[in-house]
């Protein structure tokens, strides 16, 4: 079983408009509301792939109830209730553009943070892999992911971390390391304080930096150019075919789903990397975030090339 953690979920609201007019009324006919957050995208893709998934995070108010009630029944909902209202994130789709309005989310109390920590420990009993995705809610310290990873490691669970900024830096500088991190080039550049390119020799060198010591897998997204990965002392380039992209939103989360599935099933390096990239590509071919059409899985799987470099 795979446990997905979304500490700062949201209701994602989509407002499609022919034209966004400022300082006046804009009427929307076709409104879409879905449970949002990186970890919930991971949950949905794992569920569609056929994995057993348990989803947790911090939710509150009517919007928190909406998230719980609108996840597929086959996803085990194990969310922790807080006093604040779960945030709403609005995407206005207009004239080929996407304007986003993102709420910060609720402020968690010390008691709520401690309560979730105990809740997390309890949920580990029957899982093999834990995914930790997205931003931390207000009130949580930057090193909170580090705390959850330490608990997971002590219980013999594999962890996949997909976050950025201070939360990622705190984990890299901490004592307890995740099994996998999945930065993109921009996030890698931010961590290292220098601009990184798709040059394989340069990537090889930086991924051996002491900053990444103790992390078994480092999987760097190169966007449409695939992936550069390090597993222990072996490096891989994953070459992916060109596809028609409908929406790339959520493709990174779908890739995390593939990584988690590969770890849960003890797959070899090539199988794990191939599965992860196929699920990311399948999501990019769909309008709905966190959704994959499994009918196209085998064809794409055969087109992925994983090379040791």
Curated annotation (Swiss-Prot):
Pfam families: PfkB. Keywords: ATP-binding, Kinase, Lactose metabolism, Nucleotide-binding, Transferase. GO terms for cellular component: cytosol. Its EC number is 2.7.1.144. One of its GO terms (biological process) is lactose catabolic process via tagatose-6-phosphate. It catalyses: D-tagatofuranose 6-phosphate + ATP = D-tagatofuranose 1,6-bisphosphate + ADP + H(+). Belongs to the carbohydrate kinase PfkB family. LacC subfamily. This is Tagatose-6-phosphate kinase. The gene is lacC.
């Amino acid at each position: 079983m795979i446990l997905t953690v979304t500490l700062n979920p949201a209701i994602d609201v989509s407002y499609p408009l022919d034209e966004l007019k400022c300082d006046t009324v804009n009427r929307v006919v076709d409104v879409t509301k879905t449970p949002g957050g990186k970890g919930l995208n991971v949950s949905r893709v794992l569920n569609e792939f056929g994995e057993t998934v348990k989803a947790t995070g911090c939710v509150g108010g009517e919007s928190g109830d909406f998230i719980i009630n609108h996840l597929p029944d086959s996803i085990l909902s194990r969310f922790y209730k807080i006093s604040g209202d779960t945030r709403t994130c609005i995407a206005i789709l207009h004239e080929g553009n996407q304007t986003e309005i993102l709420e910060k989310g609720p402020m968690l109390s010390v008691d709520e943070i401690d309560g979730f920590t105990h809740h997390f420990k309890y949920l580990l009993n029957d899982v093999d892999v834990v995914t930790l995705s997205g931003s931390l809610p207000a009130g949580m310290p930057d090193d909170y992911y580090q705390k959850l990873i330490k608990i997971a490691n002590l219980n013999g669970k594999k962890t996949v971390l997909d976050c950025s900024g201070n939360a990622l830096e705190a984990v890299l500088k901490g004592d307890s390391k995740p099994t996998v991190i999945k930065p993109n080039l921009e996030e890698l550049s931010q961590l290292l304080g220098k601009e990184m390119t798709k040059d394989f020799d340069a990537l090889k060198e930086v991924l051996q930096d002491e900053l990444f010591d103790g992390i078994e897998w480092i999987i760097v997204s190169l966007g449409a150019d695939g992936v550069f990965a390090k597993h222990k002392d072996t490096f891989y380039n994953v070459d992916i075919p060109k596809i028609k992209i409908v929406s790339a939103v959520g493709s990174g989360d779908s890739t995390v789903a593939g990584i988690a599935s590969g770890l849960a099933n003890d797959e070899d390096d090539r199988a794990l990397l191939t599965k992860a990239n196929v699920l990311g590509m399948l999501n990019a071919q769909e309008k709905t975030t966190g959704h994959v059409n499994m009918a196209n899985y085998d064809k794409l799987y055969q087109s992925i090339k994983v090379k040791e470099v």
